[in-house]
Swiss-Prot record:
PANTHER family: BETA-SITE APP-CLEAVING ENZYME, ISOFORM A-RELATED. This is Aspartic protease-like protein pytH. Disulfide bonds join C338-C377. It comes from Aspergillus terreus (strain NIH 2624 / FGSC A1156). Pathway: Secondary metabolite biosynthesis. It comes from the Eukaryota.
Amino acid sequence: MWLSVALLTLLDGALAAPARQHSGAFDMPLTWTPFGFTTDAIQIGTPPQPLVCFVDWTWIGQYAFTPRCHGGSQGTYACLQHGQPLYNETESRTFANQSVLYPERTWNPNHFFFYNDLSVGFGSDIERVGPDHQARVTLQLADMHFQLDMVYPFGGVYGLSPVFKSDNASTQSPFYQMWQQGVYRSPLVSFVYCHNSTFDQPTPRRELCHGKDGLQTLGGPSPVLSLSDKNNSSPILWYDNIVFPPVNEIEFVYQPAVYNYWALRLTRHLIGDEEQALNTSIGGNPGAIFDHASYGRGVPMSENSYRRLIEITGGRPVVLDANVAPNNGNQSFVSVDCEKVSSFPNVKYVFEGHDRVWEVTPANYVERREVDGKEVCVLNVRTLGEGDWIIGNFGETFAKDKVVLFDFDKLRVGLADVPAAAY
């Protein structure tokens, strides 16, 4: 795209990552993996044990693989595969056992291991995030009751779920725990995705994500927003978070139930200018869950709106292996004419609280894939539920040209456009 002289002048001093404007924040670089985004910025214990963590907007604490297996630490590899990254509390002189304060907990089913137990004990230790942020936090210490069938490319889960008033430290995000101790001055976290271009459309520059795939800012708004000027502002629209119980029945099924999600109500869903029906039979407008892990891949649609998009785009059924499919949803996939993608309609959403229409362009919801040695363009759509819209996940596909923010104090979700100067 052509840049105006004024914009070129603005960019002249902005090609490096912008200077941090909010003291006390940390811009945590993220690496894309098939599971979701991970970070290598976390260490736990004394001396510090590096722990690559999966960053999860839908989990309620700092989870860590440990040597524990069936309640003991002697038979670790009867549960874990050799080479599995983990945190070993016996090697930390600052570890404190919290088993009396918080008894062991088990979820079954769960969305980690499904119908195998997700069992954790509790302890606290010093967690370091980046070079300058550290505090004692409560940890969820994995106690495996079965053998993992693979080595996971991370040793823990850094949860960023909202924290409710009734929650104690056993189900609190490690970010929230540190913010409560004054380590971060702001209760905000924010995300920007420096993704690869599929159809040569502009994408946020990699240096804005410190050369990585994404940036999860802890303790403030994304520094990308500081690139806006007075004539090209990118205001944040804030939406009040809701509790949406059907999420534990339709999507992330846990027993005991988990309801800590960044969630909004959807008031409109459109394909181009064509309104799509919403299912309002569950006590109001349907739900929108924010999740940038693998379950947030694909533009969220209902079964019926996906069927309509297939009609509009002339989609044809295509069979994709799991390692080729653009997302892990249960819906079927269709191929479309790569030459016609620019003519496809935007997929649109309106959330309760504002009339702003948020859009996903066809260049962001169509993916190129190789099938039998040939390039195929595939609709990257993920559906949940049956019939009209009842629930959907808003993650990396939705966020390709947006900044997503969460406010842990006021329990709000914020959305903003990525400023033009970031491209």
